[in-house]
Amino acid sequence: IVMEYIEGKTLKQLIKKRGSLTLSEAIDIMLQLTDGITQAHDSYIIHRDLKPQNILIKDDGTIKITDFGIAVALNSTQLTQTNSVMGSVHYIPPEQASGKGSTIRSDIYAMGILFYELLTGSLPFRGDNAVEIALKQMHDPIPSVRKKNPSIPQSVENIILKATAKNPKNRYADAKEMHAD
């Protein structure tokens, strides 16, 4: 497999350098991300490891989603319903953390966490180890993005809250719906 060379940096590198991004930058990135993930989902692919390290940003602001290494086809149920936990613990949805299968809404959760990180420069859940973070993903409410930055509109916080709902049924049905909000 060959991938095009992309001049730029990862979103993680950008966040480390700058901390939080401006609201307009974060929204632009999220609009591109939801478009890209919509294309993946429309092709019956769940990424399962969305995080800033897997999103490259070119100098012109265009993003590229990378590392589909643990992605899985939606019709490949034996791969999405194993007892192995896939993905990075800081972005893993509660259902995956508890060993259940991945769905489109698993990627929605990760995008909500990513949006939070873009706007605050930090992760919503921290811990001393992966298990502690996974337990917080499963049980703790996501901290208010507006408490960290009161200039963020309530409508944007509502997008994050809906995307990161603990129950997948309460999240956006797909990336297209998240993009529309």
Question: How should these model regions be labeled?
Answer:
Residues 29-30:
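Activation segment signature within eukaryotic-like protein kinase domains
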Residues 64-67:
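Pre-DFG segment of protein kinase catalytic domains
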Residues 1-10, 14:
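Conserved short submotifs of the Hanks-type protein kinase catalytic core
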Residues 82-92:
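Conserved activation segment of eukaryotic-like protein kinases, specifically the C-terminal portion
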Residues 57-61:
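Activation-loop N-terminal segment of eukaryotic-like protein kinases
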Residues 90-181:
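C-terminal lobe helix-coil module of Hanks-type protein kinase domains
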Residues 33-45:
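Protein kinase catalytic-loop region centered on the HRD/HxD motif
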